């Protein structure tokens, strides 16, 4: 959910959904982790790299940079989760077919229980499919195989 992704489908709705869940985690005093992608168009500290201003990120949250779609690859995320005895994670963000999909599959292979904030994920239209088609396609693959879907009314399961 970085500035470089300004053309995300239903961006404002997704940000509002994510913020509601972030607020629930903050109220429960549970960790909130932000993963920021870095590449030539999204260099660290650049405007494109920065999180959307509207996200309810706090200085006390945990932040990692990544260079691959996999949020675990050379980030310290797996160590953080294990050191904090967290065996389940909740995922939200963008982009469905890149970072979200890869992170779900890697987390699954690492043995984590995964909950997906289904209204808190998005992507952009491709040359072949709309963002909604991409999301629906991936959701059909993930559901009950790799992850369970949650909403902002679901209890937090950590």
Predicted regions and their residues:
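Active-site-adjacent betaalpha module
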Residues: 16, 23, 28, 40-158
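A short alpha/beta connector and helix-capping loop motif
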Residues: 7-34
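Conserved H-loop
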Residues: 37
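Short acidic, Gly/Ser-rich segments with clustered Asp/Glu that frequently serve as metal-coordination loops
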Residues: 1-6
